[in-house]
Amino acid sequence: MHDVTVPDVNIGVVGHVDHGKTTLVNALTGTWTDRHSEEVKRGISIRLGYADATFYRCEKCEGTEAFSTSPDCPACGGKGTPFRSVSFVDAPGHETLMATMLSGSALMDGAMLVIAASEKCPQPQTKEHLMALELVGIKKIVIVQSKIDVISQKEAIDNYHEIKAFVKGTIAENAPVIPVSSQKGINMGALVQALDQIIPEPERDPDAEPVMLIARSFDVNKPGCNWKDVKGGVVGGSLIRGILHADDKIEIRPGRQTQVENRIKWVPITTTITSINAGSKKVETATPGGLLGVGTRLDPALTKSDALAGQVLGHEGKLPPVWDKIRCRVTLMERVVGATSELVIEPLKHSEPLMLSVGTAVTVGVVTNTKKDSVEIQLKRPVCAEEGSRIAISRQVGARWRLIGMGVLGE
């Protein structure tokens, strides 16, 4: 029997900076995902934020009023029945943080595209994030028209038509548009119902070898704590397939960098799982869907400050290969989106530096060989990925990395 309080999917929250993504996650979960001091100061998300919500259905109410993320029904005050939990991945909307958004997209089973009704649609990062969802293959999308409390009904309807015109011909063409006010809690039931219908739990293979994409890693020890109380390093991310158990012997790849006879080598890290947290619950067994915190016996110095973000965790000797040079089939977009002027995208050139997002890993590489639609790239940092993985490709345009297309690894 599935525990309804353990999240079964990850839902990305994407869109332009300051369109209300973090406020929306707070309204749904009660968690403010900007915990980083710099984020609070600047009022923008810098790292990926995570929060879980349980969906409740009230048996007395009908339609959208029956749905909420609160045990007490907001419409009638009766008791709601919990039927499902989800994890939200709050991605930064600022153009300089596109790499962070792309690394988060690897964890997403579906996404909410948040568009503020108070601004003209589309804004630059609204375009860029929708293009990113299209490139990494996220098809299950709910569009959230936010901030409807600060505009008139006519402006909201005009903005709705702008949104529909913008998504025409994209993967979000048939996505529902849900108008909400996160500040006032308006229409949250309709949003919960739409998320439940559009982003169901995907089919999972429980017998597959486990593969967990690491998006965060940390040292949970307080400065100056007694050495007897020191806890091992913790990694956070999402299990994309298979099952993990407490006490499993695991390997993390590419691992850590070492120098052997003046050559840099990457050595896989092996350790044992000491604890697993799914959402805020301690569990013995982890299944795909939702975000996990995995406690290990690693030296916390190895995991502090997201040092292992972008790596892959699984059973010893069973992980996908590690690549320091890749060949991929490339599909480039026609124009650069997200910039003020939309430049035509030129073909990839020999010796050109590129930023590649593979799973949760973000690495830089240099083009060593180009053919008609395939390219070879020498990576600065190796990545652990399966053949056939999708790779988001960005190039420097002006002083920014801009998304220009996608590749398929090893073709």
Where are these regions (language model features)?
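Residue-level signature of catalytic and energy-coupling elements of molecular machines
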Residues: 18, 24, 43, 90, ...
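Conserved Switch II/interswitch segment of TRAFAC-class P-loop GTPases
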Residues: 83-87, 91-97, 106-128, 134-157
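Conserved catalytic-core segments of large NTP-driven translation/proteostasis enzymes
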Residues: 2-3, 165-308, 312-319, 324-332
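P-loop NTPase switch module centered on the Walker A-proximal segment
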Residues: 1-99, 108
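G-domain G4 guanine-recognition motif of GTPases
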Residues: 116-118, 139-157, 177-188, 310, ...
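C-terminal effector modules of nucleic-acid-centric enzymes and ribosome-associated factors
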Residues: 10-13, 151-153, 299-411
